[in-house]
UniProtKB/Swiss-Prot annotation:
Gene3D superfamilies: Aldolase class I (3.20.20.70). Belongs to the glycosyl hydrolase 56 family. Inhibited by heparin, and to a lesser extent by DTT, Fe(3+) and Cu(2+). Not inhibited by reduced glutathione, L-cysteine, EDTA, Ca(2+) or Mg(2+). Residues 352-407 form the EGF-like domain. It comes from Olivierus martensii. Transmembrane segments: none annotated. This is Hyaluronidase-1.
Length: 410
């Protein structure tokens, strides 16, 4: 009994100190960003969700534009002259090794000025290049053509070389070219719009397509982690990381609730491992199951957003394509899902993340539950002001603060 009283008193003291410190501290900033072309619903069918979203603290571009003041995404045809191969032929030279990087950067500069006219843009900027991968070994399936043609380029210069020699140099030339293209493009957007958080969509990946009855079975394999370590140049230069944790229909049919949580945790765990202290992390999440017109089950949406928050991350990007809003029926379904699921869940998670930050982390970081990595999301989806116990929590500190509760100034 005495011990319980002492623990209660200690908690109250820490809580009071946290509230006092919060007066002058910077609040945790958990951002949920809307990246769905819902403007199509507004224009075609007079179905608007902006007020619903913004009233629940979800960030929406002004006038619902797909690219705007909160978020901008550059697809393959929108930033410079991105070289890649399509079924109907080569685009912008096809192969990185023989394409004009200088011209690409020149045109990209104009694209950036057009798409982001405000030099003080401080939203999230995403480069979405998916036609090839920078590491040789991951250009499989339809991407294997990049490997074949890279070897052809080397063989044309050195027809007397052995296949092993050709492949060795082809790998070096491909990976060096990919690094140069990705880094110089990233540096350009960061130089031109330095206040934004910049990332490449889908990076890092975990390729964790299988798993059974243990959480560790879903973790990124050692060889995947070693490959991701080879991209250290990308993690160092990126000011944000934007992995995908899209819920698939196969996840619902193949995995139970715990397994789905393990799968997502594994991908976020790898992102955290690779991130630098000041790197922001904004995972991409979805509300429509890819390849279908079915919405993500409401409990899964709650868990996913709660997981992101409970790992101390900076927010999430809710994505949807024009395909999801091209009929009145789809627009009505979107509005219903926003009203019943997205808006209340986002509002609750944002509020709980910020409240825990103020109470436990002095407003200098976000709460993390180290001993409950797979279930701590439940604390953040509770709309009834749950109690946060400092004994269960460590803080992911920001702004140079350190210590378990960010109590040590930089």
């Amino acid at each position: 009994m005495t011990q319980n009283i002492q623990m209660t008193e200690m908690y109250q003291i820490i809580l009071f100190a946290s509230i006092l410190a919060a007066i002058s501290a910077t609040s945790a900033d958990f951002k949920v960003v809307w990246e769905v072309p819902s403007i199509m619903c507004s224009k075609k069918f007079k179905i608007n969700v902006t007020d619903l979203l913004t009233s629940h603290k979800i960030l929406v571009n002004q006038e619902e534009t797909f690219n705007g003041d909160k978020i901008v995404i550059f697809y393959e045809s929108q930033l410079g002259k991105y070289p890649h191969i399509e079924s109907h032929g080569d685009i912008n030279g096809g192969m990185l090794q023989v394409s004009d990087l200088a011209n690409h950067l020149k045109i990209a500069r104009d694209n950036i000025s057009k798409f982001i006219p405000d030099p003080n843009f401080n939203g999230v900027g995403i480069i979405d290049w998916e036609a090839w991968r920078p590491l040789w070994k991951y250009n499989w399936g339809r991407m294997s053509e990049y490997r074949d043609r890279s070897k052809d380029l080397v063989k044309a210069k050195h027809p007397d070389w052995s296949p092993a020699q050709i492949e060795k140099v082809a790998i070096e030339e491909w990976e060096n070219s990919a690094k140069e293209w990705m880094l110089k493009t990233l540096k350009l957007v960061e130089d031109m719009r330095p206040n934004a958080a910049w990332c490449y969509y889908l990076f890092p990946d975990c390729y964790n397509y299988g798993g059974k009855d243990q959480p560790s079975e879903y973790f990124c394999k050692n060889d995947i982690q070693e490959a991701n370590d080879k991209l250290s140049w990308l993690w160092k230069q990126s000011t944000a990381l934007c992995p995908s944790i899209y819920m698939q229909e196969s996840h619902i049919t193949k995995y139970n609730t715990s397994q789905r949580a393990w799968w997502i945790y594994a991908r976020l765990r790898e992102t955290i491992r690779l991130s630098h202290p000041n790197t922001l992390i904004y995972p991409y999440i979805n509300y429509i199951l890819p390849g279908t017109k079915k919405t993500v089950p409401s409990m899964d949406f709650k868990r996913v957003l709660g997981q992101i928050g409970s790992l101390g991350l900076d927010g999430a990007i809710i994505w949807g394509s024009s395909y999801h809003v091209n009929t009145e029926e789809m627009c009505k379904e979107m509005k219903t899902y926003v009203k019943d699921v997205i808006a209340p869940v986002a509002s609750t998670v944002i509020q709980n993340v910020n409240r825990c930050s103020q109470q436990i982390c002095k407003g200098r970081g976000n709460c993390v539950w180290p001993e409950e990595p797979y279930t701590s999301w439940k604390y953040l989806i509770d709309p009834k002001n749950p109690t946060f116990k400092h004994t269960n929590i460590s803080c992911k500190c920001k702004g140079g603060y350190t210590g378990r509760y960010c109590q040590i100034a930089p």
